[in-house]
Structure formats: structure tokens, C-alpha cells
């Protein structure tokens, strides 16, 4: 019934005053809507003069600047025609080297805001200020403030104006010095101030420094059409044909009339299945049928225990390159800090695990040094573990001199340092010289800095029967020299095996005592044999006990003790059996 009354009322208003007024259909408000639109939709079309409350979506407002207002049905249709206008926020404006000159924070559709550039900067049009407009999709543009162009540096040329700074798009004319010309062969030229500075450098060139066409390369070419002439510092780029890879710089540069070294185009070989030492490809059995593969392919792999990839992980990617697989050594040995034993020193680094070819530093305690005489050193993780165990050894102190004096004033010496010394008058070293040198080694000095009186030297050591010295004999031996003796086989050395030179004479030499030779002939004469042995000939040293027993069918004719004979300097008393 209400709907019928609304229709009759609408027709009556439309025909009032004899004028036909067009009713308004339900308003489809872009970026907004009527309040209670589901209930109100039934009462449309509406007569002119009707008003309805409506709201706008987020980031949109009514023409009055509110988030809601009234929309009015007029004879020309709905008013306002655009109920919801887009808003733009001042906070969305990013301006470097400038600032917004207005105080408002929100702007509606088609509203303009002004911005100013800082001193020394200008808009893209060369002005100190500009404007942006709020459009349907936001601000028309982000404001830009760019720097002015200063007077450039001239090379073999001079400016034709006296200005010191230039606005965007300003032109600066310059002329070349006598004998020089611009890149186009002219003696004058111009540069333009752009957003990134001057269009080019105001440079003039000596024509003798120009280059001809760049050199050709096998399986490759330049990326641009070659010219007949190139100016100094011109650059030309090369590229390779398909299946070739560029090696070296892809650019050549003209300098002093010559081009720099051009690159090479290397054939890209395929890669065979990678046999990874101490590791494997993931899913290698599945992947193996797809090899060889082209350059640029990569595969994941893992390393065995105690091995890692070059990046320090247990897995990584191996890459096919024109030179083969990379990394060339996919799995590297690791070394542990705990495997290092260092006496009188300490490791100066905190890491506990090191990969192949990685160095670790160590330091020696005060008063100790490395084998090279330094306070610190390094060892390297190799395929079989650490390169060496670090060593810290003590310095050599000033030695005690005998009949001699040092030729330097130092008090301590590093490993491999040399100390020169000289003998007192009337004394000489072992080789007959009056000066000598000693070297600081790991166990101390190489020898004592001792000089001798020639009357205290000895000749060759005395010979002994059935024995000899263990070293080649010298003509002369210095005091306290020692020579070692040894006996022939089966002879027993009696006494000290060394003799010493003292006051020109050798100490008492040792003797070589004869062995006892037990023969089958002597045993047969006495009807005896060796106890527990089947030897027919036996050698015994002095002091050795030889046990005998009667042969089968014979009885002892001497005492029981005689069957345990003792060898005395080659003589033995045999027992007898009858």
C-alpha cells in the first residue's frame, strides 16, 4: 500500500504546474552508498526535491569534506553529481631537498598543493617551486628538486660565458684551444644542464690520439656498428656468438691511438658426471643418465663426515662452467683445533674447526720462539691433517767461552743466529784457525766456542786387536775429543768403548776378548753333546755358560759341575763321558 502511495505521489509531483519533472532512479554512488539502502531501494524512483543521507568509503569524502552528507534529487538529476571525492594525504608526498609550503594535511580530488625547493636546488623545469594535484589514483606525481649545474672542468677548452651556475636545460657554449677539436671535429660546441648534470664533458682532443675501428675477435663481434674514427677514451663493447663465453673485459678503450686488449670467445664445453671425492650428488643415481650437461647447470651435493664445502656447510651447489665443475674441490678436509699440541705457546684464534688450506696462528710464551726465531707462527690444514705441530723453543743465551772471546755484545740469540768468536793468543780452534762461529739450533749452540793449545792435541787413537774405531781416523784430534771402538763378530769388548784425548795422550783403549768355539771334533773326543741344541759348532762369549750332556750310551766321567762349563777368554774346559 505504501509503495502504491509513493508511486501516485511521484506522478503528482512530476505533473505539478503542468510541467513534467523527471524522477530520480536509485543513486549508484561510486566509492560510497546510501544509508539503509536495502530498505530505501523499494521507494525509487524518487521525486525531485527528495534528499537522502549517504556515506563515503575510506580515503574518500563528500564535496563538503565530511565522510557523510545528503544527496538531493533535482530536475537535472542527483546533486552532487560526484558524491564521493578521492582524498590525498600530505604524508604520502616524498620530497628530497624540498618541502611542502602549505599547512593542510588532507587534499581532495583536483586540489593542488605547492612545494618549494631548498636553496641550490630547482624543479625539473628549473623553478624554485612547483605544484602537484590530487587525482583519482593519488598525487599526480612525486615532487622533484634537483641541483643546479656548476661551471664544469674544461679539458683543452674554455667557456664562452662568465656564469658560475646554470639552471636545468641551460646551454653553455665552449671553444677548443688551438690544435684541438671536439668529438665531432669542430672547434666549438655546447653542453646542456640536465637532471644528472651536464650532457657531456667540455673536452677537446688531439686528432693524433684517435683510433681506427676496434680489432675483430674470433667467434664474436662488437655490439655496435663500427666507425671509421674513435676519439680517445671511447669504449666499444664485444659479445660472443651462441655457445661461446666471453673471457676478459667485454670493453676495449681507445688510448693514445691504440685499443686496449680485446676479450676472447671461449667454447663452452659440456660437463661430465662429477665424481666428488669425499662426497656425492643428491639423487645421483637418478641424475646420472642426464649427463653430460651444458654450461650453467647446477646440482646440489653433500660431503662425507669430517669434510665440508668451501662455504663451510655440509652441502652446497656444484656449477658447470666453461672450465669444468666449480668448485674444483667440492669437499674440503676439516682440521680440529683440539688436535694441536703446543708446548710453551698458545693458539691466538677462537675458531675450533678449520677447512683445507686454512691457516691458524699461534704465539710463543715470552722467552720462547718458533723454529724460525719468531714470536709467532702459523700452521695449515692439509688433506691429511695439520701441516705440522707448532713448536716454541727457547732462545740461545750467551755461551761459556774457553780460551776464547765473543766478537759481538748480544746477550741472547734467535734460532739460526750465528755468533762469531776468536781465540786468545797462542790458542786455536779444532781446525787450526784462530776464529770460528757457532749457530743457535733447536737444542742450543752447534758446539762450544773452545780454543786449544796445540801441544794438548792427540794423534790417531791406538789400534786394538780384533777391533777397530767406528769412525774414519783423523791426523789430529783436539783435547777432549772422543773416539768409539767396536769388536769383530763374537769378540767381547772389555773396558770403555770410548777413548778420550787429554794433554796430548789417549786414555786406555778397550780389549776385544776371544770367543769360545765349541766344535764337533772336541765334543766327539769327550763323547758329549750340547744340551738342548743340535748345533755342531757353537760360539760363546767370555762369561757365557755352556751346558753339555753325555751322548747316548755314555756316562759322565767328570763332576756334575763340569757339564756347565764357563767360557773364559776363548778357553773352555770340556767334561768327559766314558
UniProtKB/Swiss-Prot annotation:
Residues 1-19 form the signal peptide. Glycosylated. Residues 20-85, 86-147, 148-206, 209-267, 268-332, 333-394, 395-453, 456-514, 515-578 form the Sushi domain. Its main location: secreted. Pfam families: Sushi. Keywords: Disulfide bond, Glycoprotein, Repeat, Secreted, Signal, Sushi. This is Complement factor H-related protein 4. It comes from Homo sapiens. The lineage of its organism: Eukaryota, Metazoa, Chordata, Craniata, Vertebrata.
